[in-house]
Design a protein with these regions (language model features):
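Helix-start/capping segments and mature chain N-termini
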Residues: 1-80, 84-88, 114-288
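Short, acidic/charged, Gly/Pro-enriched secondary-structure junctions
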Residues: 80-112
Length: 288
């Protein structure tokens, strides 16, 4: 029987200093008006794929989560407690039938200004149908300069996505589905709004090498596995013109997984013969 996603998310609150975890009703408020997540966007998060009852690529997500907390000088996350909350939320969400997919989000903020106590919670919820459609149909993408600077010394996945979301709204208003950011000075490719860019030419997989790019957990898993399967994987400087000449271009991320770029600005990109193979590589990488 096919798994039917729940309408309501499952939420577990995590005690940041390693205490208990507890279930939270989604119909009740969770954070206060003076929480730094609301007033400053001061916090970190990770989006994880749950597939058949298990979190994909959890070691890389956990490592980046800890690094992000360190970069923002938040108390070190007690990862075992986050994993415990995640397992409980997954069990509640799937109700014993651990087939199908879901999205899991870890959120960790600096907390209330009045208490200085961090806020932390885990959510498991249905994957947006639009993301599932994009896996199958691909996305139309426009390139755009990233006009804000990302410090190399702050390699954190923070909650402050306001500028990125504004850029996505602009792109969608122009008929595109997504964006690829480029350096405003050099024009080299950086990353997608919520994804890493991967270009395929023959048996070569390439991803941008540039300053200010957040390390992609999904891209790293893909490259590690693909290398073992005989692909030549490398990070290098990439231009939009290079992408247009490739066999295929992909946006890879944890929940949406691999989405093919069908057009870049005004250029339609050809459909590759090995699209299923590339998706299969990523699925296999995430299943390990």
């Amino acid at each position: 029987m096919e798994f039917t996603p729940r309408k309501e998310p499952v939420i577990y609150v995590v005690e940041p200093y390693g205490g208990s975890v507890r279930k939270h009703l989604p119909s009740l408020p969770l954070i206060y008006w003076d929480d730094a997540a609301v007033t400053r966007g001061d916090g970190i998060f990770e989006s994880l794929l749950v597939r058949d009852g298990k979190v994909a690529n959890i070691a890389r997500h956990s490592a980046r989560f800890v690094n992000s907390a360190q970069a923002l000088e938040l108390p070190e996350p007690q990862i075992e407690k986050w994993k415990e909350a995640t397992e409980l939320a997954i069990a509640d969400y799937f109700g014993g039938d651990e087939t199908g997919e879901a999205k899991c989000t870890w959120t960790y903020t600096r907390g209330r200004a009045s208490t200085g106590h961090p806020s932390a919670w885990v959510v498991v919820q249905a994957i947006d149908k639009k993301l599932l459609e994009q896996r199958e149909k691909g996305v139309k993408v426009m390139t755009t300069p990233r006009l804000w600077h990302v410090a190399e010394e702050l390699p954190a996945k923070t909650l402050n996505y306001a500028a990125t979301m504004a850029t996505l709204r602009l792109a969608k208003g122009k008929g595109f589905d997504d964006v690829i950011f480029v350096d405003p000075d050099s024009g080299i490719v950086l990353e997608g709004a919520t994804s890493s860019v991967v270009a395929v030419r023959g048996n070569k997989l390439r991803t941008p090498a540039a300053k200010g790019i957040l390390s992609g957990t999904t891209q790293a898993a893909l490259f590690e596995y693909a290398q073992q399967q005989g692909y030549r994987c490398k990070a290098k400087e990439i231009t939009p013109e290079y992408l247009e000449r490739c066999d295929s271009v992909w946006l890879v991320s944890s929940v949406r997984t691999a989405v093919r770029v069908t057009s870049l600005n005004d250029a339609k990109l050809k459909a590759p013969d090995n699209a299923a193979e590339i998706r299969g590589l990523l699925d296999a990488a995430l299943a390990r």
